[in-house]
Curated annotation (Swiss-Prot):
It comes from Wolbachia pipientis subsp. Culex pipiens (strain wPip). It comes from the Bacteria. Belongs to the UPF0335 family. GO terms for molecular function: DNA binding. This is UPF0335 protein WP0746. Coiled coil: none annotated.
Length: 85
């Protein structure tokens, strides 16, 4: 029984340590992403728009098209002006 508990405890410790390492790597990646956004902002890029583009690029084409159609419909319903109108 003690051997089983020892093995189980070692397994648990290994999982915890792996998760902790991955969490640190995640923080490091988030820091790098923040640095890239800061550099882009320093060069005059609009960060909010960049984040929107990244979010849209993650979507599948059909979902993105559906969202754009709904956005257009809502804008028209609110009487928002469009180019060419």
């Amino acid at each position: 029984m003690e051997d089983t508990l020892k093995i189980t405890a070692e397994d648990l410790k290994n999982y915890i340590e792996r998760i902790e390492k991955l969490e640190q790597e995640k923080r490091d990646v988030q820091d790098h992403i923040r640095d890239v956004y800061a550099k882009a902002a320093d060069e005059g890029w609009d960060i909010k728009v960049m984040k929107q583009i990244i979010r849209l690029r993650k979507m599948d084409d059909d979902d993105r098209e559906e969202q754009e159609i709904l956005l257009d419909t809502y804008k028209r319903a609110l009487g928002m002006n469009y180019e060419g109108e």
